[in-house]
Curated annotation (Swiss-Prot):
It comes from Glycine max. Residues 43-118 form the KH type-2 domain. One of its GO terms (biological process) is translation. HAMAP family: Ribosomal_uS3_B. GO terms for cellular component: chloroplast; cytosolic small ribosomal subunit. This is Small ribosomal subunit protein uS3c. The keyword rRNA-binding applies. Belongs to the universal ribosomal protein uS3 family. NCBIfam families: rpsC_bact (TIGR01009). The keyword Glycoprotein does not apply. CDD domains: KH-II_30S_S3 (cd02412). It is found in: Plastid, Chloroplast. Its main location: plastid. One of its GO terms (molecular function) is structural constituent of ribosome.
Length: 216
């Protein structure tokens, strides 16, 4: 049987890099991982509550965390950075204070930076959010998948694959539907493939969305 490996972990050190960069003693390792999860969840929740564009996409491409003894540096890569436009400094300060309360940062400075992504629809996270928004609005899954593939092709990718699993269109039996356009060489380690696994809650139940994008 074919064994499926995570495309990002498979390419670490060649075309992919770690999202979190820090060193820790074995006793503190789990605490640092939990802290990273809290940071990511806090950012996503804040953006969900405060910033939403019309299509329902939050627009977070990637969140990178770098830690030192006295500093936590968080870099948010956004496709549609509403944070950058309206009251940037005020909203970033609000997000920082929210995060500091949750993390109990003692003797450590928290610094948040927002970077605009050049081609938003080259990021699988943003594509998955777009499909999730369409499915929540009861758009046909085929239409949502085709539209997502159109958007990635316009962004200049070499290939894209989208998969949706679950009770699609409210059918009683769960199934898996997928579509591929262009090349997606999953076995080639030097191929730059971005991957995302996203969960969306609809009125019929939970659907899983997976997106593979071959950029170069």
């Amino acid at each position: 049987m074919g064994q499926k490996i995570n495309p990002l972990g498979f390419r670490l050190g060649t075309t992919q890099s770690h999202d979190s960069i820090w060193f820790a003693q074995p006793t503190n390792y789990s605490e640092n991982i939990q802290e990273d999860k809290k940071i990511r969840d806090c950012i996503k929740n804040y953006i969900q509550k405060n910033i939403r564009i019309s299509s329902g996409v939050e627009g977070i491409g990637q969140i990178k965390i770098q830690k030192r003894i006295d500093l936590i540096q968080v870099i948010i890569y956004m496709g549609f950075p509403k944070l950058l436009i309206e009251g940037k400094s005020q909203k970033i300060e609000e997000l920082q204070t929210n995060m500091q309360k949750k993390l109990n940062c003692v003797n450590r400075k928290l610094n948040i930076a927002i970077v605009k992504v050049a081609n938003a629809y080259k990021h699988p996270n943003i594509i998955a959010e777009f499909i999730a928004g369409q499915l929540k609005n009861r758009v046909s899954f085929r239409k949502a998948m085709k539209k997502a593939i159109e958007l990635t092709e316009q962004a200049g990718t070499k290939g894209v694959q989208v998969q949706i699993a679950g009770r699609i269109d409210g059918k009683e039996i769960a199934r898996v539907e997928w579509i591929r356009e262009g090349r997606v060489p999953l076995q080639t380690i030097r191929a730059k493939i971005d991957y995302c696994c996203y969960t969306v809650r609809t009125i019929y139940g939970v659907l899983g969305i997976k997106v593979w994008i071959f950029s170069k």
